């Protein structure tokens, strides 16, 4: 049986939405409502599709720029490397807001932002636009993301204040002037590679830095052991 075929004549189908001259967004909504009602096993996927659709609509309505929050005015080109579902919360200034607020509340002497896993520059550029940071250093593995990041930096008028580097390895700190690490904050988000990237040597070199690490221990079978090892490595220099 076709999954969109009604079980009885009284049941609405996604196609009915088209007959009522509904908007594209409304048609998508009706379709997903039908899926959730008749195929609950598909619900997680349907919710994610709807979330992405709404997010894209919010992003387009605000001219593809952040409209609220500390990064207000941040413009990002099409081709974002983040998921579609993140665009809306970025636009509303809610994307990882607790992390943003925490970074902005750091002592004012910290004016250098370093990011490993910079993607398109939401943090690296946004923090410069906030007026809180003077410069950013962004490590990004993907060549396409680095190109988009460079374009976004020019788009927002901060290209002269941002340094874009390639993939960070365990000795990434050697690419930075030690003087640049004295009044800096480091954000690491590399989808599970943090356990291979950060060790005793890097924590020692970054002893004067505030460090934020997005942990992905759950992606590794031995995630708990990796997490414990990371804690031991940083215990001498960071709390």
Give the location of each predicted region.
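S-adenosyl-L-methionine
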Residues: 1-142, 147-152, 161, 174-181, ...
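Structured loops at beta-to-helix junctions and adjacent beta-edge loops in soluble globular domains
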Residues: 70, 79, 167, 214-216
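Structural motif corresponding to alpha-helix initiation and N-cap regions
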Residues: 97-100, 169-170, 195
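Conserved protein kinase catalytic core
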Residues: 121, 146, 172, 195-197, ...
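Short, surface-exposed basic-aromatic patches at helix termini and helix-loop junctions that form
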Residues: 128-131, 154-157, 202-206
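Conserved acidic-Pro-Pro-aromatic motif
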Residues: 134-141, 181-186, 192-239
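Conserved SAM/SAH-binding loop
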Residues: 165-173, 190-192
């Amino acid at each position: 049986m076709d999954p969109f075929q009604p079980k009885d004549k009284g049941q609405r189908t996604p196609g009915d939405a088209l007959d009522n001259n509904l908007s594209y967004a409304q048609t998508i909504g009706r379709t997903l409502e039908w899926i959730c009602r008749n195929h609950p096993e598909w619900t997680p996927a349907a919710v994610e599709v709807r979330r992405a659709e709404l997010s894209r609509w919010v992003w387009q309505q605000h001219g593809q720029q952040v409209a609220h929050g500390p990064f207000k005015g941040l413009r990002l080109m099409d081709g974002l490397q983040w998921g579609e579902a993140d665009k809306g919360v970025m636009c509303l200034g809610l994307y990882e807001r607790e992390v943003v607020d925490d970074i902005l509340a750091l002592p004012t002497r910290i004016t250098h932002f370093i990011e490993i896993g910079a993607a398109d520059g939401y943090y690296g550029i946004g923090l410069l636009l906030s007026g809180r940071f003077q410069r950013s250093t962004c490590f990004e593995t993907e060549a396409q993301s680095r190109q988009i990041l460079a374009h976004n930096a020019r788009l927002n008028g901060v290209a002269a204040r941002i340094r874009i580097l390639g993939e960070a390895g365990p000795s990434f700190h050697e690419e930075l002037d030690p003087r640049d690490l004295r009044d800096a904050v480091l954000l690491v988000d590399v989808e599970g590679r943090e356990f291979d990237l950060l060790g005793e040597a890097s924590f020692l070199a970054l002893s004067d830095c505030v460090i934020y690490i997005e942990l992905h221990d759950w992606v590794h079978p031995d995630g708990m052991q990796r997490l414990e090892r990371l804690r031991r490595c940083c215990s001498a220099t960071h709390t």
